[in-house]
């Protein structure tokens, strides 16, 4: 959430920055500043009213002791009137602030200066590529046909049990899933990330804190009876561990990793982009989350990008790293780098990770702060990234490593799978 101070002092800067995200903020910013002016004026009036009320109330006892009942009664009447007025101001202030807050949450985070301009994914900038694209033999198959051929993923059974987008992994397919999760977690913990196992349902405050609510409410599964939400990513519960926390100056860096199943409605998805594992309603993902001092968050972002790149490269998958343009960025991000792997049988790039710096945007919503070296309370910066999302990794592994009679497993995974190939 953007700060009122920033909106009040630099409204044109905010409007120009959000235009990079193709977001027209002028009307909202102008309304916010009017409401903010009202908020401050009402608070000043309320403070004066309460101070006068306290001053008058203190006079009553002395007047009564002096036997000045009529004067005391007159002051009591004044106090009662001031009390009524303060109540009216408080009610007006609550209504004003409610409208103010409802508008504040509609503003996305500002993109940082490194974000390129652009409207769609076509405008994203490729900053690096690695590993060669394999040349497959004749009669190569997409992963959904390979899954059926080797009986490792059953999409039809998932439809029977739940619906489309909920596959059932079987045999070596299930073991490959488990191997990838354990490999990713081990690689993350080896560089200092603390493993946590969070709930996969969160309350509304958690969804609001990381910015999924209200922006992505329509894409989240909502258990309405208890008002809980299934997590779309481990980012939500893990980052919220530090909601309403004030860290010490020496508590940094905070580095956490978690595996969770993730749940997304993905309403409106259709066509080739959703075949097989390309887009699911339930999928497995390992996440890394960091909390940093503002002056150290971009160095942390570079570390996270390098770590995710090392993970992807170790699997032998052809990959590319993209810096997202303003129009393709998420609501909460200040900058995002996407990792994509090449799916040889489909002949297309598949996103497997996003690594983002949110600067203080989430921290402001979370009330996640720290005391600096001078003891001053400041907002922290939050970052997260997928390390990695499994479905498209599996799709690319199956397709790129297929032979006529088997699918070879990358060497780094063999200690985890217990087998060298799927046949």
Language-model features and meaning:
Residues 26, 129-423:
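TRNA-recognition modules of translation machinery and tRNA-sensing kinases, especially anticodon-binding
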């Amino acid at each position: 959430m953007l700060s009122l101070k920033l909106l009040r002092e630099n409204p044109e800067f905010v409007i120009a920055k959000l235009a990079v995200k193709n977001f027209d903020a002028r009307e909202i910013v102008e309304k916010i500043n009017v409401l903010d002016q009202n908020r401050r004026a009402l608070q000043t009036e309320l403070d004066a009213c309460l101070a006068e009320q306290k001053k008058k109330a203190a006079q009553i006892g002395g007047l009564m002791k002096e036997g000045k009942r009529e004067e005391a009664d007159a002051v009591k009447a004044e106090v009662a009137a001031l009390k009524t007025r303060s109540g009216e101001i408080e009610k007006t202030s609550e209504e004003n602030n409610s409208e103010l807050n409802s508008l504040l949450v509609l503003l996305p985070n500002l993109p940082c200066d490194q974000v390129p301009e652009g409207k769609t994914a076509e405008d994203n900038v490729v900053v690096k590529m690695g590993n060669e694209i394999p040349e497959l033999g004749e009669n190569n198959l997409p992963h959904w046909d390979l899954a059926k051929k080797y009986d490792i993923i059953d999409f039809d059974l998932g439809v029977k049990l739940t619906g489309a987008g909920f596959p059932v992994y079987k045999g070596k397919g299930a073991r490959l899933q488990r191997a990838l999760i354990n490999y990713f977690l081990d690689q993350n913990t080896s560089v200092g990330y603390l493993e946590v196992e969070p709930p996969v349902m969160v309350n509304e405050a958690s969804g609001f804190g990381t910015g999924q609510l209200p922006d992505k409410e329509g894409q989240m599964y909502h258990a309405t009876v208890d008002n809980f939400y299934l997590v779309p990513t481990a980012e939500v519960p893990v980052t919220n561990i530090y909601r309403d926390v004030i860290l010490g100056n020496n508590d940094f860096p905070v580095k956490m990793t978690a595996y969770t199943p993730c749940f997304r409605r993905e309403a409106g998805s259709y066509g080739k982009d959703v075949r097989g594992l390309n887009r699911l309603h339930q999928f497995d993902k390992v996440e890394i989350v960091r909390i940093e001092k503002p002056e150290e968050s971009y160095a942390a972002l570079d570390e996270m990008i390098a770590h995710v790149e090392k993970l992807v490269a170790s699997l032998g998958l052809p990959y590319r790293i993209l810096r997202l343009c303003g129009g393709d960025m998420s609501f909460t991000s200040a900058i995002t780098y996407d990792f994509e792997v090449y799916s040889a049988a489909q002949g297309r790039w598949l996103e497997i990770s996003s690594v983002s710096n949110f600067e203080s945007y989430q921290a402001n919503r979370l009330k996640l702060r720290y005391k600096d070296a001078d003891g001053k309370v400041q907002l922290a910066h939050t970052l997260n990234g997928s390390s990695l999302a499994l479905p498209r990794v599996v799709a690319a592994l199956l397709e790129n490593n297929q032979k006529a009679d088997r699918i070879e497993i990358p060497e780094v995974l063999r200690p985890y799978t217990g087998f060298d190939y799927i046949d």
